[in-house]
């Protein structure tokens, strides 16, 4: 896949959460919320503090979903990122 976000935008792939709770209860797919963290796949030329392969946390409704090569990604502005997981 060749995709370069413009300006201060990032291309992010969601990171799936665990399917069970701490007590061992299995959460069905239709009851799960979309994850609010993801891996940075590509960054635009104006993004300064976030790098490719960083895992970031963002708002539940941030970004726009797109499909590239059959996979789902989010495109969002860097201001939608709350922080980087270290």
UniProtKB/Swiss-Prot annotation:
Recorded GO cellular component terms are: cytoplasm
Under InterPro entries, the record lists: Chaperonin_GroES (IPR020818), Chaperonin_GroES_sf (IPR037124), Chaprnonin_Cpn10_CS (IPR018369), GroES-like_sf (IPR011032)
**Classification via Gene3D superfamilies:** GroES chaperonin
Q: What is its main location?
A: cytoplasm
> Where are the coiled-coil regions?
none
What GO molecular-function term can you cite, just one?
metal ion binding
Compartments it resides in? Cytoplasm
The family database entries (SUPFAM superfamilies) matched by this protein are listed as: GroES-like (SSF50129)
GO process annotations (BP): chaperone cofactor-dependent protein refolding
| Keywords in alphabetical order | Chaperone, Cytoplasm
Could you give the subunit structure recorded for this chain? Heptamer of 7 subunits arranged in a ring. Interacts with the chaperonin GroEL.
The record, for NCBIfam families, names: PRK00364.2-2 (NF001531), PRK00364.3-3 (NF001537)
- Describe the function of this protein: Together with the chaperonin GroEL, plays an essential role in assisting protein folding. The GroEL-GroES system forms a nano-cage that allows encapsulation of the non-native substrate proteins and provides a physical environment optimized to promote and accelerate protein folding. GroES binds to the apical surface of the GroEL ring, thereby capping the opening of the GroEL channel.
Q: Tell me which family the UniProt entry assigns to this protein.
A: Belongs to the GroES chaperonin family.
HAMAP family according to UniProt: CH10
Q: What is this protein called?
A: Co-chaperonin GroES
**Species assigned in the record:** Sulfurovum sp. (strain NBC37-1)
Q: What is the lineage of its organism?
A: Bacteria, Pseudomonadati, Campylobacterota, Epsilonproteobacteria, Campylobacterales
């Amino acid at each position: 896949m060749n995709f370069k976000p413009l300006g201060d935008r990032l291309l992010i792939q969601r990171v799936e959460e665990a399917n069970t709770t701490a007590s061992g209860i299995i959460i069905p797919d239709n009851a799960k919320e979309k994850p609010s963290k993801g891996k940075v796949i590509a960054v635009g030329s104006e993004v300064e503090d976030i790098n490719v392969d960083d895992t970031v946390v963002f708002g539940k409704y941030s970004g726009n979903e797109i499909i590239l090569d059959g996979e789902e990604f989010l495109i969002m502005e860097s201001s939608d990122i709350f922080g980087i997981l270290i």
